[in-house]
Design a protein with these regions (language model features):
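Solvent-exposed loop/turn segments at secondary-structure junctions
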Residues: 70-72, 124-127, 156-160
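Short, low-complexity N-terminal intrinsically disordered segments enriched in polar/charged residues
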Residues: 16-53, 57
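Positively charged n-region of N-terminal signal peptides that target proteins for export
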Residues: 1-3, 17-18
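Bacterial N-terminal signal peptides
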Residues: 6-15
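A solvent-exposed, acidic/Ser-Thr-rich amphipathic alpha-helical stretch
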Residues: 53, 57, 61-110, 114-116
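Exposed beta-sheet edge and beta->alpha loop/turn motif
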Residues: 114-148, 153
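Low-complexity, intrinsically disordered terminal/linker segments enriched in charged
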Residues: 150-171
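Mature soluble domains of exported/periplasmic/lumenal proteins and thiol-rich metal-chelating peptides
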Residues: 49, 54, 65-66, 132, ...
Length: 171
């Protein structure tokens, strides 16, 4: 009986150990997202109040924005121009309008090429005097070593937004 009990306990203990093979093969790991959330929230607040200059101060010179229709806007100047244009259409641009926005901080990459990103899921609201559109919104925001926004990838259904435009500003 003692031998069987010893064997069972040994297997139970060994099966609880974390093996190196359970690590992410791409080297990604979760990190505390607090600082990235603060930056993303400040960026969102700047957009929501129409303070494009403040939003621009949080962007890296090589910043970019990817949209679900395949459009990539590259370079800080191009992103700022897009924000100015969209801000003419919407008086409210709130990319975390839902109280249930979920965040996840992730880091990874090879030595010397590390990256960190904030993943967020929630609702985005775009509104003006005549219309309000709220869509489920998924976003990945990459940050530079200087905690500037390096790139944003937004994933959402653009159908209602495009229907609101006379001319789609993101094409």
């Amino acid at each position: 009986k003692k031998i069987f009990l010893t064997l069972i306990l040994s297997f139970a203990i060994l099966s609880c150990e974390t093996t190196t093979s359970s690590a992410d093969p791409d080297g990604r790991s979760l990190i505390d997202p607090t600082e990235m959330i603060e930056i993303a929230t400040a960026f969102n607040n700047a957009l929501n109040t129409g303070d494009i200059e403040m939003a621009a101060s949080m962007l890296d010179e090589d910043a970019g924005w990817s949209f679900p229709n395949g459009v990539n806007v590259e370079g800080k100047e191009a992103v700022v121009a897009l924000l100015e244009n969209v801000n003419q259409i919407w008086t409210t641009i709130d990319q975390s309008s839902g109280e249930d926005t979920a965040y996840l901080g992730v880091t990874g990459g090879d030595e010397g090429e590390e990256w960190k990103a904030l993943l967020s899921w929630g609702e985005a609201t775009y509104a003006n005097d005549s219309k309000s559109v709220t869509v489920p919104y998924h976003q990945v925001t990459w940050f530079t070593d200087d905690n500037l926004i390096g790139w944003i990838s937004g994933l959402y259904d653009r159908t209602e937004l495009v229907a609101s435009y006379d001319d789609d500003p993101i094409k």
